[in-house]
């Protein structure tokens, strides 16, 4: 099997992956700020790094996968106040909702899922170290800030030059800062903030800045220097750039070897975001589409490419996934172990080892499905299920998928018992030699999105189309 190559944002190139400890991978991914329901952009991040950790384990690595939860933030505080509830009540509720969405999408839970509020002492310890090392200062307004110009390598991840950056590029100007580009490590508490929004420190009551949270959690759980750090493309600057400055400024060590960033989800060629008001929650999408269809929609696009969201693309994903399940419908796979020396296994592995090239891996699944359709071979069916399973797909009994209605069909389509009644009426018509009536029922069901297949022996199977 070829070596795994990962596109490293830091190097701006694909690189052969070499873990710091042979056979072990330590990976941190920036998770979700829990003040609302997860949207499709979140779904992409969740699925992408679920695929990454699945593949790393599949090729033999022992993986420690950490994905954090941001459970203290200005947006969280505002939403809790608006709702008249405590911060913990709000965040617990949306963490629960996030877990429900993950389960629906077939996301395997990370090995560790730290909440920012569980690591306040570690954050304060890192801030004090940065102050000791000359990278941090307490401003007149009580905030503790990071002095960006003190860190010589600032900009190495994003490629941005300090001289080219201006206050306002995702950085709020503040007269209390020594430099407009400096960013906050510890926010001084305001008098009107609710309970649970601040902690005691040598700097006064306050709460951590967003960036220090991930530095402290990553270093605490994975060590000062670890293998992979991931997140959405929008986090490359300033969040991940600032993480590097904080972590390396505090420890004096390289923070991360490989930086991975997934591309945006787009609607009408614009980034899907709450600020633009063009986002859809996972729950809204799952009302209309099967969760595995949504996962397949995400999986079949390379993780670094833009993902264009539309009903047309989701409908196409549903049709494509239906083709894969249909290939398995009447074939019982054998129970042999996956053999990477088989040609399809080799092509699949080569694709996944080429920076997780899921479009090519999915194409291999369709090649296999075509061969299964032609040969009805149990070995090929087993390979199809096994390889698809590495992507979190084709885990259901084929008929269960093919007969399951989408959310839209559940709202206005035929229920299974209604379909069976129509099939029984068609059987009766055929027995009475009323073939015109039998054809009418078949056509009526097809119009309603139900395809019939007459089997040897007189039985009839159905699936949704």
UniProtKB/Swiss-Prot annotation:
Question: Where is it localised?
Answer: Cytoplasm
Motif mapping: 'KMSKS' region? 271-275
The keyword Aminoacyl-tRNA synthetase appears for this protein: yes
* Catalytic activity entry: tRNA(Cys) + L-cysteine + ATP = L-cysteinyl-tRNA(Cys) + AMP + diphosphate
Q: What class of enzyme is it?
A: ligase
A GO CC term attached to the entry: cytosol
Recorded E.C. number(s)? Answer: 6.1.1.16
Keyword line: Aminoacyl-tRNA synthetase, ATP-binding, Cytoplasm, Ligase, Metal-binding, Nucleotide-binding, Protein biosynthesis, Zinc
**Chain sites annotated for binding Zn(2+):** 30, 214, 239, 243
> Sorted alphabetically, which SMART domains does this protein's record hold?
DALR_2 (SM00840)
Locus of motif 'HIGH' region: 32-42
Q: Which GO terms describe its molecular function?
A: ATP binding; cysteine-tRNA ligase activity; zinc ion binding
Q: Which residues form a coiled coil?
A: none
Could you tell me the superkingdom of the organism this chain comes from? Bacteria
One annotated GO biological process? cysteinyl-tRNA aminoacylation
Which Gene3D superfamilies does the annotation name?
Answer: Cysteine-tRNA ligase, C-terminal anti-codon recognition domain, HUPs
Co-factor binding comment: Binds 1 zinc ion per subunit.
Record: residues binding ATP: 274
Query: Per its Swiss-Prot or TrEMBL entry, what cofactor is needed?
Result: Zn(2+)
Q: Which family does it belong to?
A: Belongs to the class-I aminoacyl-tRNA synthetase family.
Q: What is the name listed in the Swiss-Prot or TrEMBL entry for this protein? A: Cysteine--tRNA ligase
């Amino acid at each position: 099997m070829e070596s795994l190559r990962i596109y490293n944002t830091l190097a701006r190139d694909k690189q052969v992956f070499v873990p710091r400890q042979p056979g072990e991978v330590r990976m941190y991914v920036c998770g979700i700020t829990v003040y609302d329901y997860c949207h499709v952009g979140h779904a992409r991040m969740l699925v992408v790094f679920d695929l990454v950790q699945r593949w790393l384990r599949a090729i033999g690595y022992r993986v420690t996968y950490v994905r954090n939860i941001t459970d203290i933030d200005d947006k969280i505080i505002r939403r809790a106040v608006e709702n008249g509830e405590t911060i913990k009540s709000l965040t617990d509720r949306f963490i629960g909702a996030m877990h429900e969405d993950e389960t629906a999408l077939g996301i395997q839970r990370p090995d560790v899922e730290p909440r920012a509020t569980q690591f306040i002492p570690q954050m304060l310890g890192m801030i004090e170290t940065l102050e000791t090392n000359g990278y941090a200062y307490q401003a007149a307004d009580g905030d503790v800030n990071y002095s960006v110009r003190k860190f010589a390598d600032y900009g190495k991840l994003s490629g941005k030059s300090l001289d080219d950056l201006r206050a306002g590029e995702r950085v709020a100007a503040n007269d209390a800062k020594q430099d407009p580009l400096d960013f906050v490590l510890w926010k001084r508490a305001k008098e009107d903030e609710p309970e649970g929004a601040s902690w005691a420190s040598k700097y006064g009551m306050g709460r951590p800045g967003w960036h220090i949270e991930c530095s402290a959690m990553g270093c605490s759980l994975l060590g000062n220097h670890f293998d992979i750090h991931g997140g959405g493309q929008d986090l490359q600057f300033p969040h991940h750039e600032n993480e590097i400055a904080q972590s390396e400024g505090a420890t004096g060590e390289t923070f991360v070897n490989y930086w991975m960033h997934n591309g945006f989800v787009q609607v009408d060629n614009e980034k899907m975001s709450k600020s633009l008001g063009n986002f859809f929650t996972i729950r809204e999408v799952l009302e209309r589409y099967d969760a595995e269809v949504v996962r397949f929609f995400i999986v079949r696009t390379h993780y670094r490419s833009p993902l264009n969201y539309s009903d047309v693309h989701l409908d196409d994903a549903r049709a494509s996934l239906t083709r894969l399940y249909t290939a398995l419908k009447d074939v019982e796979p054998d129970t042999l172990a996956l053999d990477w020396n088989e040609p399809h296994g080799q092509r699949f592995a080569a694709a996944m080892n080429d920076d997780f090239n899921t479009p090519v891996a999915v194409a291999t699944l369709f090649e296999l499905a075509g061969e299964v359709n032609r040969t009805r071979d149990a070995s090929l069916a087993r390979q199809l299920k096994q390889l698809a399973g590495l992507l979190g797909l084709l885990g259901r009994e084929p008929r269960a998928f093919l007969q399951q209605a989408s959310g839209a069909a559940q709202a206005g389509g035929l229920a299974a018992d209604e379909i069976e009644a129509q099939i029984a009426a068609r059987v009766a018509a055929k027995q009475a030699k009323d073939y015109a009536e039998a054809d009418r029922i078949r056509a009526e069901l097809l119009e309603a999105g139900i395809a019939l297949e007459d089997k040897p022996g007189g039985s009839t199977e159905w699936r949704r189309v």
